[in-house]
Amino acid sequence: MILGANGERLSKRHGAVSVTQYRDDGYLPEALLNYLARLGWSHGDEEIFSREQLIEWFDLSSISRSPAKFNPEKLHWINQQYLKEADNTRLAELIIPFLEKDGCHVAGGTNLELVVALLKERVNTIEELADAAVYFYRPLEPTDELKIQYFNTETKPILVGLIEKFNHIEWTRESIHHEIKTTAKHHDVKLPKIAMPLRVMVTGEIHTHSIDAVLELLGREETLARMNSHLSSFPD
């Protein structure tokens, strides 16, 4: 028997859903199988195992006699481990429906496999992976609060100068990082003073992967277009 976190029999009141709902929510089938098998059975301290290992190791004598409690956080964690090891081509195919549902046009945009490789370490589900990838395929408008916090008269001329520098450098993560770091040193400001408004201009968010890696994948043309589009949002 599977119980909810409160010790009661698992039911719809606990958010119990069908197997297909877990698929639609972005869980990998092998992760769900791993989690369900581990609910009432164990093989030492092993938490992650393949289908083949499950077949090899499974023994009725190792089944717990006590009811198991369903733990969504544990399922998240197991799914995350599988996502980290999953093939990027497969993950790219899996997130396309989520991105299209969010109004993104993947064809002709940033290489989706490279985006997946960059982002998959920090997410728990395919749905979260797609959410994290949205800004690569359509610009996100920063909130007014973010504009007030990061778009100011002090940083505007610095970013205008950075746009000029970005026009002429080799478009690699290393070169982008070097230019941001050099610009910060030249203006005697800390790196976040430039990186944060730059991140907001380009992604519309403040929590992303390293900004140099994001810009490299986004590409020079799209990066500069987004930066230029937000210069008018800075106070004079």
Model-derived regions, located:
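Short, surface-exposed helix-loop/turn micro-motifs enriched in polar/charged residues
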Residues: H43-E46, P67, A107-N111, K190, ...
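Short coil/loop linkers at secondary-structure junctions
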Residues: L28, S42, S61, H105-A107, ...
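Alpha-helical recognition segments enriched in aromatics with Gly/Pro capping
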Residues: M1-L83, I96-P97, H178, M196-V202, ...
